[in-house]
């Protein structure tokens, strides 16, 4: 049976959101496919999103960027981390190639760590990158166009393909770029069930608050009450607010809660934006102007969904009631149909 080894970046949950639907489609097409997932993402989150059976291995195929919050990049710390990661690059790649040979991998799919690609290329194993961004462009934006940036780009450029999920960064300098349609696992709208369980009066709004898997939270306990609005928050935030509802108490998958919400408050991120457009959920997002992926994501959501930008200060103070009312008064576009997972699964099946 073929063995697919999948590397998923731990820099936020968007990488899991892009990869999970593809692995589920592959399992449907090839039930005997052996899957190994290497990631720093907690196994509990991986299992909540990936429904195909897989073996978990902890692993770091990239270091992303050092962050002080969900919005703020630590440039100096990131530069130092990359220098350390690349200090003995040849030995690191050799170790990676040895591990992949020991796993008897038939194909390597990486979202979007470049070390697994380099290891696969040295071991002669077919490999592809998948993502809406790449770390060469992100690193270059913050740390400059130097030898490290060139080495990262080289790993991506030598893959059999870079499957660029839409919406995504342009990546014009990659000769192996293969654009694919949006990727999302769309939940089921179970709002009537939620209304009964929570005993919500008619017209009550549920607003989901998400940081996309990056540490940090908004000070919801400081937000003023908005008549007819309830906040869906995660348990780890320990929010004390009369209108807060803890997600985990609802015993419903995150995707179903997402699809059952009246709005999403988030930072610009692939999983959040695409799942919102596919679920027909309006979005309030806080500006993340320096993140290079943001312009492509925002332009796409403005075209295919409903969204409004709110300032960081407005979110810290809870001063956005008028923006919510505005977005709820607008006509809702037709939900996006995400075809990217099928496209990528078909592409991989042809090569297994």
Enumerate the language-model features and the residues they cover.
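A nucleotide-sugar donor-handling region in carbohydrate enzymes
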Residues: 138-216
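Conserved nucleotide-sugar donor-binding subdomain of glycosyltransferases
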Residues: 72-107, 115
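A donor-sugar binding/catalytic signature common to diverse glycosyltransferases
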Residues: 107-111, 253-296
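Conserved nucleotide-sugar donor-interacting segment of glycosyltransferase catalytic cores
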Residues: 95-153
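Short amphipathic alpha-helix
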Residues: 16-26
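Donor-nucleotide binding loops and adjacent catalytic segments primarily
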Residues: 23, 183, 189-263
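C-terminal amphipathic helix plus adjacent low-complexity
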Residues: 321-352
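Conserved nucleotide-sugar phosphate-binding/catalytic loop shared by glycosyltransferases and other
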Residues: 32-87
């Amino acid at each position: 049976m073929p063995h697919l080894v999948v590397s998923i970046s731990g820099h936020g949950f968007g990488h899991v959101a892009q990869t999970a639907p593809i692995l589920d489609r592959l399992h449907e097409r090839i039930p005997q496919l052996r899957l190994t997932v290497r990631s720093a993402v907690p196994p509990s989150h991986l299992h909540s999103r990936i429904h195909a059976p897989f073996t978990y291995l902890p692993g770091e195929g990239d270091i992303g960027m050092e962050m002080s919050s969900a919005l703020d990049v630590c440039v100096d710390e990131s530069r130092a981390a990359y220098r350390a990661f690349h200090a003995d690059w040849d030995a690191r790649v050799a170790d990676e190639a040895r591990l992949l040979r020991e796993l008897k991998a038939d194909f390597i799919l990486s979202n979007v760590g470049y070390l697994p690609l380099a290891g696969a290329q040295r071991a002669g194993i077919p490999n592809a990158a998948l993502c809406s961004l790449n770390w060469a462009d992100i690193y270059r934006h913050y740390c400059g166009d130097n030898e490290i940036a060139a080495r990262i780009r080289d790993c991506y450029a030598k893959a059999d393909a870079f499957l660029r999920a839409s919406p995504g960064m342009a990546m014009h300098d990659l000769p192996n770029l293969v654009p694919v349609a949006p990727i999302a696992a769309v939940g089921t709208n179970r709002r009537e069930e939620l209304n009964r369980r929570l005993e919500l009066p008619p017209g009550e709004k549920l607003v989901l608050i998400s940081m996309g898997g990056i540490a940090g939270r908004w000070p919801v306990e400081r937000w003023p009450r908005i008549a007819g609005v309830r906040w869906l928050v995660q348990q780890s935030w320990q929010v004390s607010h009369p209108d807060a509802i803890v997600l985990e108490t609802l015993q419903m998958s995150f995707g179903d809660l997402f699809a059952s919400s009246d709005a999403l408050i988030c930072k610009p991120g692939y999983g959040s934006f695409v799942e919102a457009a596919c679920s027909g959920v309006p979005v309030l997002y806080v500006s993340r102007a320096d993140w290079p992926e943001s312009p492509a994501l925002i332009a796409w959501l403005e075209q295919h969904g409903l969204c409004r930008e709110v300032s960081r200060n407005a979110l810290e103070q809870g001063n956005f009631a008028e923006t919510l009312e505005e977005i709820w008064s607008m006509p809702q576009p037709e939900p996006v149909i995400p075809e990217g997972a099928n496209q990528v699964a078909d592409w991989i099946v042809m090569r297994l």
